[in-house]
């Protein structure tokens, strides 16, 4: 750019074009590969789930969540890879806006969940009860629920009585499981032999009487309390989700403005070459079709 216009050069001009380009290529490629990996794992998990599932519902299926997440990451990251390789302003702007929208939506979702904390907890508890109804028919939910109940020493969603929603654990049901809870709710030492009937006839007990046999606290509150007690892990998790997206938006913005500066430099140079050269207005709309710099 001519010296007389140097004061108009944006701050991003201090960044090397090649440094920004290769940084964005590496950033996009890494998440493109991660998205492909997540998508592959999700497809494989869903194929395995289809072999053994007895329900048509995809409720709380981790495979479905992985597939959706993988598709979004794969497509968005591919746009970033293509845009950074081609220096295509339209694709670069689309990539930046998509990342920005995702980031804003996640922040808004988190804020709304905090503001309406009670409603969020009720929503989670209702969905857990729906899963409990099909506990023995949905292997994915069963594995997740068993892991959470053992890991966080809890039982059910709101509390242990949620297990009455299951047809086998309802107190009016026939069979040995009636009015009981799964053994993963039981209080036991790691050295004890697993007693799968340890939760026998506990749903109809009062909390004070049941708390010496099973974990009476619900898993929703148990998980929330664990996150609050381990706030460093929570902060690290949030940073791990939000920071890469923010860096992607910032890096893309810097690269877009750097490419625009180069386009402007070329336009000014072409204008000095003679009347037959393309002016800035002639090249202003070509950012979606052409690659810069030549």
From Swiss-Prot:
Transmembrane residue ranges: 24-44, 63-83, 95-115, 236-256
PTM: Palmitoylated.
Signal peptide: none
Intrachain disulfide bonds: 154-219, 155-185, 171-179, 186-198
Cell location: Cell membrane; Late endosome membrane
Cellular component GO terms, alphabetical: cell junction; cell surface; cytosol; late endosome membrane; nuclear body; plasma membrane; tetraspanin-enriched microdomain
GO molecular function terms attached to this record: enzyme binding
Main location, first listed in the record: membrane
Pfam families: Tetraspanin
Glycosylation site positions: 118, 189, 230
UniProt family annotation: Belongs to the tetraspanin (TM4SF) family.
UniProt protein name: Tetraspanin-15
Organism of derivation: Mus musculus
């Amino acid at each position: 750019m001519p010296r007389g216009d140097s004061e108009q050069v944006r701050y991003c001009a201090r960044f090397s074009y090649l440094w920004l380009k290769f940084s964005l290529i590496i950033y996009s490629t890494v998440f493109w590969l991660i998205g492909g990996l997540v998508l592959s794992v999700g497809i494989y998990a869903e194929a395995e789930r289809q072999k053994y599932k007895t329900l048509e519902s995809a409720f709380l299926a981790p495979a479905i969540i992985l597939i959706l997440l993988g598709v979004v990451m794969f497509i968005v990251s591919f746009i970033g890879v293509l845009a950074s390789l081609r220096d295509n302003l339209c694709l670069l702007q689309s990539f930046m806006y998509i990342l920005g929208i995702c980031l804003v939506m996640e922040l808004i979702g988190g804020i709304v969940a905090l503001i309406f904390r009670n409603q969020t907890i009720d929503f989670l508890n209702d969905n857990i009860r729906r899963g409990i109804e099909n506990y023995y028919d949905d292997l994915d939910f069963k594995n997740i629920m068993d892991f959470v109940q053992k890991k966080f020493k809890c039982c059910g969603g709101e509390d242990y009585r949620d297990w009455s929603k299951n047809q086998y654990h309802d107190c009016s049901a026939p069979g040995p499981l009636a009015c009981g809870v799964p053994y993963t709710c039981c209080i036991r030492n790691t050295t004890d032999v697993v007693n799968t009937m340890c939760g026998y006839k506990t749903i109809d007990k009062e909390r004070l009487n049941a708390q010496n046999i099973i974990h009476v606290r619900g898993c929703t509150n148990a998980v929330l309390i664990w996150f609050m007690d381990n706030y460093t892990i929570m902060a690290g998790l949030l940073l791990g989700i939000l920071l890469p997206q923010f860096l992607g938006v910032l890096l893309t913005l810097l690269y877009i403005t750097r490419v625009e500066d180069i386009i402007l430099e070329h336009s000014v140079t072409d204008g000095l070459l003679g009347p037959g050269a393309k002016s800035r207005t002639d090249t202003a709309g070509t950012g979606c079709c052409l690659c810069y710099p030549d």
